[in-house]
Amino acid sequence: MDFTSLIPSASKEELVKEYVGKSLHDVPCPAVVLDISKLRKNCTDMLETVNSLKCGWRAHIKTHKTTELTRLQIGDGPGPANIVVSTVVEAENIVPLLLEYKSEGRAVNILYSFPLTSGVVDRLSKVSTALGPNGISLMIDHPSQLRSVAAIHEKTNIPPLVFIKIDMGGHRAGVIPGTETCSQLISSVITLTKRNVCILHGLYSHAGHSYSSNSQTAALDYLRQEFEALLITYEEVHSVAATKLPLVLSVGATPTSSAIRNLLLSSTSSEELNEISALKATMGAIHDVGCEIEIHAGVYPMLDMQQLATHALPEDLLSWSSVAITILAEIASLYPPRGTSDSPEALITAGSLALGREPCKAYPGWGILSPWNRTSFALPNTGPEGYSGWQISRISQEHGILTNPGKNDSELSIGQKVRIWPNHACIAGAGYGWYLIVDESRTGKEDEIIDVWARWRGW
């Protein structure tokens, strides 16, 4: 059965033939570049953290949409391969990898994390059939969506696992705990579970508003709020079920999922110690009622300016050197006295389609010029909020305007290649059909392309 998108990805073989062995200085712009040494480190750090804390792990693959990076997120070994997707095309394209893991004896599961609609029933039913029992999880936040859950069961004769999405303050999706709708939803799911139409597997939250964090303490507080919202909801589930019903309580956005690593670090801040103590107490209460804690996150392998601005970890663990994604562009023109107070400006070959039009709360621009291929410029220890060098201040469809408000950065030249740290990696990568892979740990060969990863396209 073919699960590939009707929008075909570029041929891996042709991409490798075209790019591998070339230097970043010799490829067309704009292009998106990933440093595999940073990807590996970020993925390893997350896996080691959740394993040390004895938490479950679910890797979100919506940011990159590739098989290669999914492998790094899941890791080796016999443990379960649980993933989250935001689109059906991600689920369809990752089925072969999960079947490979399944053949090795690993448990596999895909969580389709958008509240279920009737339009995806047929395609998700095929995914469920391919993976078999316990292979697919569905997200719901309204009782009416259970008709689609039942339709998938009818088509496959496999009861899908179900997560109830909880709105714990982000107001993007999810049912609000303690509301009548939440009570109706819990009761309806339990009824279908008793009829073996589905299996209530867990409660899920996404603290998207945790991107407003500006310290470890703030990110930890959002994480605690996630746990508390799910624990409160579980208490109602337990009451309605009238029996012990162990569930998976799945929390995370990259700021909160990163922040949980602070539990393994030494802290000198009394405020942070108090927050860690409160968080540990909440996690302990979850274990006491027999529930499993699961962590999920997506953009953490790449990171970006939005993530640096959260300061969810100490600076030695979350810094400029952690960011694995850059956008490769070329200087097209120079306008020396055009900026504010006669500051210089430059035109680059990357606009909103190449960078995304995503803001970062720490500074007013749309991307920051990395030090690559430039004379030395000292990056601040503070993150984007302290940066005063070349940055993308204005963008249109294909034009990006670099400004140097501090007039303290190196000069640029027409034809010079530059690499930009984007504000939001998920959006910046979406305009490209593939990633150029380099390994900056290869001394003397940092700019050599060693692989190309094709992205899945469409929905």
What spans do the regions from the language model cover?
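Eukaryotic N-terminal targeting leaders
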Residues: 1-18
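Generic N-terminal amphipathic, Lys/Arg-enriched alpha-helix
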Residues: 14-34
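Short coil-to-beta-strand transition motifs
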Residues: 259, 321-328
